[in-house]
């Protein structure tokens, strides 16, 4: 048996043993028939019509009839479980280098249908790049043919009873038109049904044993990870096309998988720098995309504007406090109209235009226009009048803070408790210092240059002797 590498010896031995032991072991014969029947039934279920598929494979792959007798079942099993024997590699034309060159040259070409993952390798090893016909007959030793190609059911009798036959596996899925390039067929079983032995779930795809890829053919010398990553990385695909026959010097799979990671990491770093390392990230990454730079710019200036307007708003709101030392809520501009009225009523000096009537919380606007004018000064609204002030007071009617006394003009009253009123009007017992007429004149300091100009015009006749001095502003010293 050592001198034979095909299926003739298993047939002869099996037939002779049947001739001698048919009467001695009827149980084994029935068992083998049951196994063969089961395997044939499973094969028909998986491949629908085994003979029709075999004729289709042979017709499309242009394989001679004498090539389908040189890959026995026990050899495929020994390749799967005991490693590749060296006798298969002793052949005149090794398909290894031709296969590598074919993969690198036909890489961008894609199939239009997915059944070609089951084709014979010899049909592609020795064919032109465009045509599908082989230029010369393939080498018999390098022609792997599936055991299922044989139409005779005796081929299944040679298998062991406990053999893990691939008939229980589902059929191969068709390859989509735009999913994989043509060399993806070499990642599958070329002449066997796809994935005769399923890969381990815990083992990575690039680290699985090579016999799972092709059982009756020498190993493909380049890593399968390259085929897995080519259609994801167009740059790497272009480099493989240019490589040609030198595709055996592929970079390690780690480098192939690292390229998209570097690109993704480079695209993520600018955003991190724009968030956590503002100025450094903006300066040390001049090659970032325009979107990241645009994101960095508005973020930086937005932070500046967030700080500066707060200061400006604080200064504007603190404008009453520039002339006095008042409470904090007054500087924030939170003084409301009812609080302003309570502050005016609490100051006895304002009794000539607003005062308590002595009937509970009632008060009267003795000079309503003066009250409106002071409220306009407080809110920096020079056009404030009593009509606008009265409309503002109606808002407090709905809120239940104050009411209009019926039958009396300019008389109002607070409807809440006096202690609660003053505690809310003066938090922390801080009386707001209101603006007065003097403060109103101070607020008109914008006209100071005009007054100086008038004074300088008045002193111009007296300063006639000072004409030689080159003072363009007209100041006289």
UniProtKB/Swiss-Prot annotation:
**Modification after translation, per record:** Sumoylated.
Query: What biological-process terms (Gene Ontology) are attached?
Result: cell differentiation; positive regulation of DNA-templated transcription; regulation of transcription by RNA polymerase II
Q: Molecular function (GO) terms listed?
A: DNA-binding transcription factor activity, RNA polymerase II-specific; sequence-specific DNA binding
Provide an example Pfam family for this protein: Ets
Could you tell me where this protein is found in the cell?
A: Nucleus
Highest taxon of the lineage: Eukaryota
In the UniProt record, does the keyword S-adenosyl-L-methionine occur? Answer: no
Record's keyword annotation contains Zinc-finger: no
Per the annotation, which location comes first and is thus the protein's main one? Answer: nucleus
Q: Which stretches does the entry tag as region Disordered?
A: 128-178
The family line of this record is: Belongs to the ETS family.
Spell out the protein name for this chain.
ETS translocation variant 1
Q: Which organism is it from?
A: Bos taurus (Bovine)
């Amino acid at each position: 048996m050592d001198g034979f590498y095909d299926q003739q010896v298993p047939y002869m031995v099996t037939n002779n043993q049947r001739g001698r032991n048919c009467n001695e072991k009827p149980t084994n014969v029935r068992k083998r028939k049951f196994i063969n029947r089961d395997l044939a039934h499973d094969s028909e279920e998986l491949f629908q019509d085994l003979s029709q598929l075999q004729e289709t494979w042979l017709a499309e792959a242009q394989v001679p009839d004498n090539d389908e007798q040189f890959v026995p079942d026990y050899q495929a099993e020994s390749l799967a479980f005991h490693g590749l024997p060296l006798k298969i590699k002793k052949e005149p034309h090794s398909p290894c280098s031709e296969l590598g060159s074919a993969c690198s040259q036909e890489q961008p070409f894609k199939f239009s249908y997915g059944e070609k993952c089951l084709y014979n390798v010899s049909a592609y090893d020795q064919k032109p790049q465009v045509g599908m016909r082989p230029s010369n007959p393939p080498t018999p030793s390098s022609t792997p043919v599936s055991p299922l190609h044989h139409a005779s059911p005796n081929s299944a009798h040679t298998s062991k009873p406990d053999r893990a036959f691939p008939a229980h596996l589902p059929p191969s899925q068709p390859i989509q038109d735009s999913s994989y390039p043509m060399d993806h067929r070499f990642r599958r079983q070329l002449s066997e049904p796809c994935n005769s032995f399923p890969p381990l779930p815990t083992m990575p795809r690039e680290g699985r044993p090579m016999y799972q890829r092709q059982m009756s053919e020498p190993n493909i010398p380049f890593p399968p990870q390259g085929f897995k990553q080519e259609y994801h990385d167009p740059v790497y695909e272009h480099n493989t096309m240019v490589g040609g026959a030198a595709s055996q010097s592929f970079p390690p799979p780690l480098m192939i998988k690292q390229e998209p990671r570097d690109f993704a990491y480079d695209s993520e770093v600018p955003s991190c720098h724009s968030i956590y390392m503002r100025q450094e990230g903006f300066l040390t990454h001049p090659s970032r995309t325009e979107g990241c730079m645009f994101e960095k710019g508005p973020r930086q200036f937005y932070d500046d504007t967030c700080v500066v307007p707060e200061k400006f708003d604080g200064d504007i709101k603190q404008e009453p406090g520039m002339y006095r030392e008042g409470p904090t809520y007054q500087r924030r501009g939170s003084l409301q109209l009812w609080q302003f009225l309570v502050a005016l009523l609490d100051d006895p000096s304002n009794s000539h235009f607003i005062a308590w009537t002595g009937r509970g919380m009632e008060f009267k606007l003795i000079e309503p226009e003066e009250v409106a004018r002071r409220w306009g000064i407080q809110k920096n609204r020079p056009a404030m009048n009593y009509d606008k002030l009265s409309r503002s007071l109606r808002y407090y009617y709905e809120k239940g803070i104050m009411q209009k006394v019926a039958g009396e003009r300019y008389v109002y009253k607070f409807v809440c408790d006096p202690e609660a009123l003053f505690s809310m009007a003066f938090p922390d017992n801080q009386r707001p210092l209101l603006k007065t007429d003097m403060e109103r004149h101070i607020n008109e300091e914008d006209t100071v240059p005009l007054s100086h100009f008038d004074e300088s015009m008045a002193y111009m006749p007296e300063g006639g002797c000072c004409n030689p001095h080159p003072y363009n502003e007209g100041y006289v010293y």
